Amino acid sequence: MSRPLLITFTPATDPSDLWKDGQQQPQPEKPESTLDGAAARAFYEALIGDESSAPDSQRSQTEPARERKRKKRRIMKAPAAEAVAEGASGRHGQGRSLEAEDKMTHRILRAAQEGDLPELRRLLEPHEAGGAGGNINARDAFWWTPLMCAARAGQGAAVSYLLGRGAAWVGVCELSGRDAAQLAEEAGFPEVARMVRESHGETRSPENRSPTPSLQYCENCDTHFQDSNHRTSTAHLLSLSQGPQPPNLPLGVPISSPGFKLLLRGGWEPGMGLGPRGEGRANPIPTVLKRDQEGLGYRSAPQPRVTHFPAWDTRAVAGRERPPRVATLSWREERRREEKDRAWERDLRTYMNLEF
């Protein structure tokens, strides 16, 4: 049985396709193009003719504007890393354009790579001394410094001069993460690398260096310390005074345990604290065994205990049994099947050799 073809309905997408009051709306006429190729050509020819017939004074006024735009585009194309290589570069280059600073950086890097000490001194000496006042830690677009170029080229004299003037190398790396000493070693100049590493190479000012921790005295431990973690150390926690403790307080450790015997052998008396002068905590710190790989707080923590296993209990040193892999199980099953087949064959041969 054939079904009649259904008429598909296409929704209107244009206001002119709509029907209004039983009548279809008229189609709007397409606007004709008011500009053809000949008219556009005539317009541009007239524009060019007006520029060529302009007076010389107007042309001289437009040329500096074009030159300024061209210079502005050339400056904007310079890498931002070269413009703000370091804060010191900005201080040394005050009053100097970015383009001049870029040229100065390349001159310094080239002089350092070629080992030209007179040119290097002229570029790095301050203006008061008759030099160019260049930055000794200037960087190019690849973050190479003069010290890196001199070390990579094996120019020992230039490296010694730059280090003597305070060139930084500690923590100063190029884009690949290599410093001046590593570049010298890769190029086959171990003497230059050793010269760099034996220098100071401090990149931080003295006021920004982290102060050395001062020596402090702990009354509870009766000792001097410099470590900031001393307050949370086990020795300090055991020495903390918890007030007078009754002498018959149970220690929580059996008398037969090796730890208790070591305490007695060291001069400790039962009922006294565990500190250096027999004061502080009288009981050991309870602990919780951690023998799984689950994260902390994954399950509720068990009860802390001082002694987890009785004496001579092998569970104290027993490791966690590793479940066998699938390959190991398959290999064992195969060995068991082969052994069973060999036993069956042996029994069969024995049975057939019997004489009744």
From Swiss-Prot:
Compositional bias ranges of the Polar residues kind: 54-63
Spans annotated as Disordered: 1-98
GO MF terms held by the record: nucleic acid binding
PROSITE patterns according to UniProt: ANK_REP_REGION, G_PATCH
Feature: compositional bias, Low complexity: 77-88
Pfam families: Ank_4 (PF13637), G-patch (PF01585)
Transferase listed as a keyword: no
Compositional bias ranges of the Basic residues kind: 67-76
SMART domains: G_patch
Cross-link (Glycyl lysine isopeptide (Lys-Gly) (interchain with G-Cter in SUMO2)): K290
InterPro entries assigned to the protein according to its UniProt record, in alphabetical order: Ankyrin_rpt (IPR002110), Ankyrin_rpt-contain_sf (IPR036770), G_patch_dom (IPR000467), GPANK1 (IPR039146)
Tree of life domain: Eukaryota
Keywords linked to the UniProt accession: ANK repeat, Isopeptide bond, Repeat, Ubl conjugation
Ranges where the G-patch domain occurs: 255-301
ANK repeat windows: 111-141, 142-172
Record-given protein name: G patch domain and ankyrin repeat-containing protein 1
Encoding gene (name): GPANK1
